[in-house]
Amino acid sequence: MALLQQRKQEIISGYQTHETDTGSADVQVAMLTERINKLSTHLQANSKDHSSRRGLLQMIGRRKRLLAYILKHNPERYRALITRLGIRG
């Protein structure tokens, strides 16, 4: 489930910390969240797609590690990010 280039640019511009930022933890978490949301809807319609389910779990694990890194280094930025993305209840 690849994201369209235009959607990627929208996400990057919305979460980047400076002009040329494309790979900060915030941007990575936002991109992973978008991919996770797309894959979740795919799996609701295709419940027997086990390879995609495995990929989803890997993406969730990667996002969890990135969020732990952000929380460790900048708790205020972490709280703002999860609120903005609408994750963590």
Curated annotation (Swiss-Prot):
Signal peptide: none annotated. GO terms for cellular component: cytosolic small ribosomal subunit. Keywords: Ribonucleoprotein, Ribosomal protein, RNA-binding, rRNA-binding. The keyword Ribosomal protein applies. InterPro entries: Ribosomal_uS15, Ribosomal_uS15_bac-type, uS15_NS1_RNA-bd_sf. It comes from the Bacteria. GO terms for molecular function: rRNA binding; structural constituent of ribosome. One of its GO terms (biological process) is translation. The keyword Transmembrane does not apply. Pfam families: Ribosomal_S15. One of the primary rRNA binding proteins, it binds directly to 16S rRNA where it helps nucleate assembly of the platform of the 30S subunit by binding and bridging several RNA helices of the 16S rRNA. Forms an intersubunit bridge (bridge B4) with the 23S rRNA of the 50S subunit in the ribosome. PANTHER family: RIBOSOMAL PROTEIN S15, BACTERIAL AND ORGANELLAR, SMALL RIBOSOMAL SUBUNIT PROTEIN US15M. Part of the 30S ribosomal subunit. Forms a bridge to the 50S subunit in the 70S ribosome, contacting the 23S rRNA. Belongs to the universal ribosomal protein uS15 family. This is Small ribosomal subunit protein uS15. It comes from Cyanothece sp. (strain PCC 7425 / ATCC 29141).
